[in-house]
Amino acid sequence: MPPLTYANYLDLEKLLTLQKPRSTPAEHDEMLFIIIHQTYELWFKQLLHEFEKINRDFSAGHLFGAIHTFKRVRTIMKVLVAQVDILETMTPSSFSSFRDRLETASGFQSVQCFVCAFLASAATLNFITVAAAALGIKEATS
C-alpha cells in the first residue's frame, strides 16, 4: 500500500474528475456552476453528520456538546449563504448559455437540502425544549 498523502487521503484523482460539463464546447461558467453545487452537496452531507451528533448529544443529556455542534452548524450555514456571492458572479446570459443542457435538473431536487432544512428546524425545536426544561421555563415547551 502506498504511503498516505494529501491527494490519496482525499481521493483527489477521483474528486477532480467529477465535474462533467454538458455543453459542447464547454461554457466557461458551467464549471463554476457544477463546483458550487457539488460543494453545496458536500456541506449538506457534513450538516447531516453534525445533526446526527446533536441528536446523540441530546439523547445522552450532553447539552454543552450539542451547543458546540450547533455553533458549527451555524458556521457551515454562513458558508453556504456566502457561496451565493460566488454564484452571483455568473451573469444571466452566461447561465442561459448552458441551462438548456441541464434539462429538468434543478437544485430544488436536492434531497439532502430538504433533509437538512427539516433537521435544522427539528433540532432547533428540540434544543429550545431541552434548554427551557433545564432552565425551568414552562412557556417555551407548551
Label every model-predicted segment.
Residues M1-S142:
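Surface-exposed peri-terminal alpha-helical interaction modules
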